[in-house]
């Protein structure tokens, strides 16, 4: 097993994370470096369970402006797709404001609706007392686009590019990233686990080798660049995730 431990913000005054500098306050509910990253391979029993829980051929319905997303259209140009039903149905949006207005009324859990309402009410400059300095775009704190209680995956590093977003349910759910049309398989590059408890697992399905999995801790944890997370068979976890358990 490979275990890569990352410093928590409570332990240090400031920390540099993959080109992103975080100067945190000491509030317990503010985001910071992930508490720990664990990458390993699944046992045959675990692998069978994960594969049985998702079927990539069973496509998720995705909607944008009231119409089903064309699988050939790359989300019809939308930037954000959010799970809005326990059956996996996704709604896609052009902006965070548009998404949060919808989610404040229609998200599948009270916690998710509350998170969207908080995001709408928050002032952009004061959403969190954390200063982020990102390459080429120092003024934007992109991780804040992910509302409270949600799990978010971005297509690019530093919380940029297209984003998939899932609410927190009473029990964990597993989704195959190939269920989305078009697929988000092998595209994830950064993540924010914006909740205090229950981490997230990412899986890479392999042929002829045990499937690697990556555990990302909870606790409002930021993972800005998967290229810096070691992959079991060499290289990094960037553009490797095939499924997510959230």
Which residue stretches match the model-derived regions?
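Hydrophobic helical h-region of N-terminal Sec-dependent signal peptides
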Residues: 8-16
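Compact beta-sheet-dominated domain cores in extracellular/mature segments
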Residues: 2-8, 28-246
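C-terminal segment of classical bacterial N-terminal signal peptides
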Residues: 17-25
